[in-house]
């Protein structure tokens, strides 16, 4: 959603801002806008179905498999990413003026986007904290652990909504009244010039801290600690785990480090640059590049946290084969698989005789011998233990 800086609020009876073009968009701003649209289109096209499949598989498997704290955190991460991707088409079309809306609709879209992004980053930090507790064996098993996890997730979403509350307060509809183009409407976040170095700067710094610096510090601290703990394990297990952790950490830093740098530069520009057409175009171009970066996590998280794991791939195969849609069928197959693992399966004799036929023949032989006054034959010997 674009950020507009204005000198006065010109609203009509529909509470829409009317804006006449005074600053011509620069070439860099046009290129940045086209790049943002292309990247977001790719994220929606690929990340949307991927997050939907991962979330559906995770929710179906939660019905048949035991649910743990990491599983609930993963489910919440996929849900937050899917909701973020769901808001992108409206924001893309609104920025291009291809879809109209009301001020209330723009406020809801702004709240949904910033809240779901914040919840996604917070869930990543919860996953890192949970793994730290598992290493130190500080987790508690019991009936209360699941309730505590749900309480933590509820607090996370409530805090995300509170952190995202400034966005809908300043979101509104802007009506473009250009003389050489057709009139259209877009959703914007509007700040007057006297709010640039106060409200807008605070908003930029808050996003930089919550979406950028805090996740980088938390993830870096945990995985450095996790790498040190790997030295106590065997070489084979250490090499396999280290490969996964390195991939996870590098992917996160490759996405987050440019975001922190761009947002820091953007915050510096808001505080120090003068307000004129050149700096406004430059600031808008930097903001467009910055707001694309968090959306990349919606594309990477399903791959890193789901498809790189063996357990999820097995459950995904069960899901696409239809075995997870019936909870009773899934539990029956799991019980049958457990019986095969616990009890050894002995080879059948060369003559194929079912158990019911063998029992019926033996009963008939016993009744015939008793009628003749002869003792019944001894029971057959048990099968050898190493069958």
UniProtKB/Swiss-Prot annotation:
Residues 368-387 are annotated as: Disordered. The chain crosses the membrane at residues 34-61, 72-94, 108-129, 151-169, 205-224, 245-268, 286-309. The keyword Endoplasmic reticulum does not apply. GO terms for biological process: calcium-mediated signaling; cell chemotaxis; immune response; positive regulation of cytosolic calcium ion concentration. Residues 62-71, 130-150, 225-244, 310-387 are cytoplasmic. Plays an important role in vivo, in particular in the dissemination to or replication in the salivary gland. PROSITE patterns: G_PROTEIN_RECEP_F1_1 (PS00237), G_PROTEIN_RECEP_F1_2 (PS50262). It is a multi-pass membrane protein. This is G-protein coupled receptor homolog R33. Pfam families: 7tm_1. The lineage of its organism: Viruses, Duplodnaviria, Heunggongvirae, Peploviricota, Herviviricetes. One of its GO terms (molecular function) is C-C chemokine binding. Residues 374-387 have a biased composition (Pro residues). Glycans are attached at residue 20. Its main location: host cell. Belongs to the G-protein coupled receptor 1 family. Residues 1-33, 95-107, 170-204, 269-285 are extracellular. Keywords: G-protein coupled receptor, Glycoprotein, Host cell membrane, Host membrane, Membrane, Receptor, Transducer, Transmembrane, Transmembrane helix. One of its GO terms (cellular component) is membrane. It is found in: Host cell membrane. PANTHER family: C-C CHEMOKINE RECEPTOR TYPE 10, CELL ADHESION MOLECULE. The keyword Transmembrane applies. It comes from the Viruses.
